[in-house]
């Protein structure tokens, strides 16, 4: 299950607003994060920075974390906002200090890094009572868009994994092709 990375040759598809917002709008993401204007937030699996651009308008700093330098190259070509810093790292091994982040989110990339080590790392770098938003492709979806269903997680498996890592899952919504979770650190 999971742990593939998105093909950088198809990176332009990640900038299709109609397609991306169909599954998670900027308003829903920012509303779930509820950031202060000086918040420090991480976009985990940021790709070309589609959602980082949105969130950057509402916070002090966004760390756009991606394992692929090629994705950061696409983001640089597009133009990186002044308050966004590109970080090349595995989610299981980020360069952040303990309790460094006010919030984190992952949009359609949870299946690429989901593991006990990665979730423990996310928990480590988030402050007490910080929000973690997970929007990803559901194994209950058709697989006609996004990764194949065998690369996806179910909402229930994702909830269990977050709870096992010390998160309190406050909301878990199942949708046609995706699920969205809102969790907090305990």
Regions found by a protein language model. Name each.
Residues 10-30:
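Conserved SAM-binding loop and adjacent beta-strand
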Residues 30-36, 94-95:
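Glycine-rich helix-loop-beta junction characteristic of Rossmann-like nucleotide cofactor-binding loops
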Residues 13-17, 131-182:
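C-terminal alpha-helical "lid/dimerization" subdomain adjacent to the S-adenosyl-L-methionine
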Residues 42, 47-94:
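Class I SAM-dependent methyltransferase SAM/SAH-binding core
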